[in-house]
Amino acid sequence: MRINLTTSDPEVSIREKKNLGRIAQIIGPVLDVAFPPGKMPNIYNALVVKGRDTLGQEINVTCEVQQLLGNNRVRAVAMSATEGLKRGMDVVDMGSPLSVPVGGATLGRIFNVLGEPVDNLGPVDTRTTSPIHKSAPAFIQLDTKLSIFETGIKVVDLLAPYRRGGKIGLFGGAGVGKTVLIMELINNIAKAHGGVSVFGGVGERTREGNDLYMEMKESGVINEQNLAESKVALVYGQMNEPPGARMRVGLTALTMAEYFRDVNEQDVLLFIDNIFRFVQAGSEVSALLGRMPSAVGYQPTLSTEMGTLQERITSTKKGSITSIQAVYVPADDLTDPAPATTFAHLDATTVLSRGLAAKGIYPAVDPLDSTSTMLQPRIVGEEHYETAQQVKQTLQRYKELQDIIAILGLDELSEEDRLTVARARKIERFLSQPFFVAEVFTGSPGKYVGLAETIRGFKLILSGEFDSLPEQAFYLVGNIDEATAKATNLEMESKLKK
């Protein structure tokens, strides 16, 4: 891994040390720049345009070289707005790709695609920077062990477990609890694994990014008093940014995560919201550069761009990056090239259900729709696998019986089916869990439930040991012992009322 230890010296003019070119043409966010013969920049080099516009306002635009056109001209894509630029303005070749600050100084801060802080909390220590373009780890460095990444969230660990160093797709509409689930995962990785998280906001609404930041401060994921104790770094390239910024912001977030993995040797969670917007931005840039479009108007390099990003997200012998990517499915068409290309890289999917959220069951993870390649007996063990399969079968049977119950009522079912329904309702409620980050809103203390405890709890429910307990005893509790204690309390309360 290449880390640049750079010390900025404002006294030395950049122009004295770097190649200088001039803007020859401007088409929206695309610039053509002419350089002297023999002084051409490399592909992906950063170019900086500094000067003043016609009103005397200062201009500072960073671009990235995308094409060498011949005749000593290059074509570059701007990372910020190009208003005020004119032909003939000086352009400085920085001699290397975009580099962003990495390390502990990034925690608790919000950055843009260039690694500049945008939260008005002052400058960031930029002595340690890293280029956003680099190769994926070599085969020899990879950790080939298949191990589960324990999240402490019952429904995830039991039914759709995450792989350490894997990639997880997070599917869910607005208002079903994506943000709260993301914040709980950030909180749990910090407490249970001593890890940190990086959140990449790629082409989503600025309002959502602001809401997430405020909620993180409120729940303690970001510590305003002592930023070093924060558990997350945020990188935003929202939907009002030029396509160049939206295309590269995912790489900026990934570069920060790689430093924590490779240098600090930590387990890292990388959130990308939304991976579809990364593809969408690549499609816009491809059209601006004049490339022939491929299927459904997407860029011909779609698979390559996705592979370049996804292959860097992996486990090495030093640490791991586990990535959770929100996936927008355009027009709910799973065969669209963007989601279809994403699915090829995913190890697990976590699907959030509006129906469960409406019932008040949080996290509203759909136990039947969520999947994982890790749920195999040789990886998770026979006990875990059998318990998960029995839970799914019980819930599936309950789902099939719901129409009959709605029309004829519960009394018309056979004894066996009534028992299945009762257990399924207990399981459904036991899959809910109080979150640490939601303590502020709910008043219930959060619970981290280990995998062994989770399996034990569901086995006991399936065995019929708790058939006599009321189903509300299983709602929003941690392990099974809390459910039995809650049942005792409920019984005492009902006796007192009588």
From Swiss-Prot:
In alphabetical order, the GO MF annotations are: ATP binding; ATP hydrolysis activity; proton-transporting ATP synthase activity, rotational mechanism
Phosphoserine PTM sites in chain numbering: 13
Q: Where does the protein end up?
A: Plastid, Chloroplast thylakoid membrane
- Which GO terms of type biological process are on file? proton motive force-driven mitochondrial ATP synthesis
Q: How does it sit in the membrane?
A: Peripheral membrane protein
The keyword Protein biosynthesis is assigned to this record: no
Q: Which domain of life is it from?
A: Eukaryota
Q: What does this protein do, in the record's words?
A: Produces ATP from ADP in the presence of a proton gradient across the membrane. The catalytic sites are hosted primarily by the beta subunits.
Family affiliation: Belongs to the ATPase alpha/beta chains family.
This chain belongs to the protein called ATP synthase subunit beta, chloroplastic
